[in-house]
Regions:
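Conserved short beta-strand edge segments in small beta-sheet-based binding/regulatory domains
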Residues: 75-87
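Short amphipathic alpha-helices in soluble, non-transmembrane regions
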Residues: 65-74
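Short S/T/G/P-rich N-terminal loop/turn motif that feeds into the first structured element of a domain
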Residues: 1-52, 60-64, 88-98
Length: 98
C-alpha cells in the first residue's frame, strides 16, 4: 500500500458546519469500523479554528481514498499527495547515494 497525505480546507463556515454534522453521523454509525482493510489512517489533525486539516493514510489506490472522501468533496478543497514516513525517507536516501 502507498502512503498519502490528504490535506483539506472547507469552503466556508457553513460548509464546515455541514461537514461536522456529516462526520459525527459517519462516526456514530460505525464509520471507522466500516473502512476497507486496504485503507489505514496513521494520523489525523483538524484545525477547527480555520477549517483545515491533514491526515496521513495508507491505501491500495486513489480510488479507495475517493470512495471514502467523496461525500465531503462539495464542501471542501481536497488535495492528495504520495508521501513517506521518516523510515521510508531514510531508506530512499540511502538507496540513491553511491
Amino acid at each position: 500500500m502507498q502512503r498519502y497525505l490528504i490535506s483539506y480546507e472547507f469552503n466556508d463556515g457553513e460548509d464546515q458546519e455541514i461537514g461536522g454534522d456529516m462526520l459525527v453521523k459517519w462516526y456514530e454509525t460505525g464509520g471507522v469500523e466500516n473502512r476497507p482493510e486496504t485503507y489505514e489512517v496513521h494520523s489525523w489533525v483538524f484545525m477547527i479554528q480555520n477549517g483545515t486539516g491533514h491526515c496521513v493514510v495508507s491505501a491500495d489506490s486513489l480510488d479507495t481514498i475517493w470512495i471514502l472522501w467523496h461525500p465531503w468533496r462539495k464542501l471542501m478543497d481536497i488535495s492528495i499527495q504520495p508521501c513517506l514516513d521518516l523510515e521510508e525517507t531514510i531508506s530512499l536516501i540511502k538507496k540513491t547515494r553511491p
